[in-house]
Each structure stands twice: as C-alpha cells, then as structure tokens.
Amino acid sequence: AAGRGAWVRTWAPLAMAAKVDLSTSTDWKEAKSFLKGLSDKQREEHYFCKDFIKLKKIPMWKETAKGLAGKVENPKYKKDKQLNEKISLFRGDITKLEVDAIVNAANNSLLGGGGVDGCIHRAAGSLLTDECRTLQNCETGKAKITCGYRLPAKHVIHTVGPIAVGQPTASQAAELRSCYLSSLDLLLEHRLRSVAFPCISTGVFGYPNEEAAEVVLATLREWLEQHKDKVDRLIICVFLEKDEGIYQERLPHYFPVA
C-alpha cells in the first residue's frame, strides 16, 4: 500500500500538468513546462487559431523566384542554390506560422504595444506578458526569448529596433543589423532551426522600408553563408503589399536565382 501511495504522489504533478488550460492559466512557468512536454501534434490543441501555417507550406525563395533567373545583371552576391532553399518571403499573419520561433518587433518594455507587437501578445495570451515582465526590459539592438504559449510558434524572440526619423544614421543601421544578429544568436543558442522575422523598425519606429530591406538582406545573406547547416529556414514575413514589393525587387540582388 505504501508503494502504491508513493506512485500516486509521484505522478500527481503530471496529472495536474495535463489539465493546464492556456486560455485561463495564471502561472506562466507551469504553462511553459507543460508545453515543453507535448508533441507537436499535442501542441496544436492549444493554438489560438485553427488556420495555422506549417513550415512546409511556406515556399522557399528558389520556388518563389522562378522566372527571375538572369533578370538581375549585377547581383551583389554569387548564386548559391543551397542558400535559396534556406530563405523565404511570405506575406501574411506572422502569428499563424508554425515555426520554431517568430521574432517580435518589441519596444523596450517588452510588455506589448501597437502593430505586430500587440498582435503577437494578443494571440499568445496574457502568459506571454507575464513572462516578459520578468525579463526587465530590453536594450535597442538586443534580443530576449520567451515561450510562444498559445502561438503555433514554440518561441518568441523579442528584439527592439532603432527609432529613425528621416534618413537613418550609420549607428541606427548598425542597431537594426544587431536586432537580426542578436535574434539569430538566440536561435542557435536554443538549437532552433526555423524563424520568421517581421519588418523591424519600419512601422511607427520610422525606419524607411527600402533602406531597412537592404540592411536585412545583407545581414541574412552573410549570416547564412556562415551558418547554413544549422538552420532550415529564415522567413521574411511581411504584412503590407508595399513591403512585399520591395523584397521581391531586392531579394534577387542578395539571393540570385541559380
């Protein structure tokens, strides 16, 4: 009888964990631990949406760019078929992507705001804000990682972009580059293989869209050249048609189609 009692006590926490409801839970640590123990299929039951998008449904750049071969006469970089399989341009809702991590264009407080920041916090639920509160802010150009909670993405990487008024300075360009590199550092540190980036700093933070795209593409290209075997996909996720057009025009210069 004593042995049976010990068995019940041992397994009681697991029985409790199985009952965690992410929409009502008030303990982010408990919820985070619970989610880590689930399979990918089990996690689906806790997503905030049913129309989530799997990574395999997001086309690689080599597929998106069919028909563009040779249209760029003097690309900035050499053709690399392998790299063209590691990058994607996707227009849609970043909160619905089932990837290892999505990046949040946050403010210094990390407690939510407007634009994509607010969308991510609303979709993930209040537990995300609770965990962010423990991180005690984030400096511009740096990044911090949390659980994704009710998001299809397992993690959220929060980064704070520079605020630019008019033409960005060299310092602001360096800070924007640092946002991407800091986020990618966390990707490697946590052994994650897929990540989606929104357009960082281009909304209310005022960074010009075209100039931002140049910084982003150069940063991702150079990083992938060094780390291509450590990741499966880097996704540039845009929401506005304007940004989609900018990246469609600029991507072939940085990722020429083989």
UniProtKB/Swiss-Prot annotation:
Regulation acting on activity, per entry: Subject to competitive inhibition by the product ADP-ribose.
Pfam family, one: Macro
Gene Ontology CC entries for this record: nucleoplasm; nucleus
Cross-link (Glycyl lysine isopeptide (Lys-Gly) (interchain with G-Cter in SUMO2)): K71
InterPro entries named in the record: Macro_dom (IPR002589), Macro_dom-like (IPR043472)
Key words of the record: Acetylation, DNA damage, Hydrolase, Isopeptide bond, Nucleus, Ubl conjugation
GO molecular function terms listed in the Swiss-Prot or TrEMBL record: ADP-ribosylglutamate hydrolase activity; deacetylase activity; hydrolase activity, acting on glycosyl bonds; O-acetyl-ADP-ribose deacetylase activity
Keyword Ubl conjugation: yes
Gene3D superfamilies per record: Leucine Aminopeptidase, subunit E, domain 1
EC nos: 3.1.1.106, 3.2.2.-
Cross-referenced PROSITE patterns: MACRO
Residues binding substrate, per UniProt: 92-94, 105-107, 112-117, 200-206, 239
Residue ranges constituting the Macro domain according to the UniProt record: 74-255
Subcellular location(s) per record: Nucleus
PTM annotation (N6-acetyllysine): residues: K96
CDD domains in the record: Macro_OAADPr_deacetylase
Reactions it catalyzes: 3''-O-acetyl-ADP-D-ribose + H2O = ADP-D-ribose + acetate + H(+); 2''-O-acetyl-ADP-D-ribose + H2O = ADP-D-ribose + acetate + H(+); 4-O-(ADP-D-ribosyl)-L-aspartyl-[protein] + H2O = L-aspartyl-[protein] + ADP-D-ribose + H(+); 5-O-(ADP-D-ribosyl)-L-glutamyl-[protein] + H2O = L-glutamyl-[protein] + ADP-D-ribose + H(+)
Assembly: Interacts with ESR1; Interacts in a manner that is estrogen independent but is enhanced by estrogen. Interacts (via macro domain) with AR.
Family according to the record: Belongs to the MacroD-type family. MacroD1/2-like subfamily.
Protein name: ADP-ribose glycohydrolase MACROD1
Organism: Rattus norvegicus (Rat)
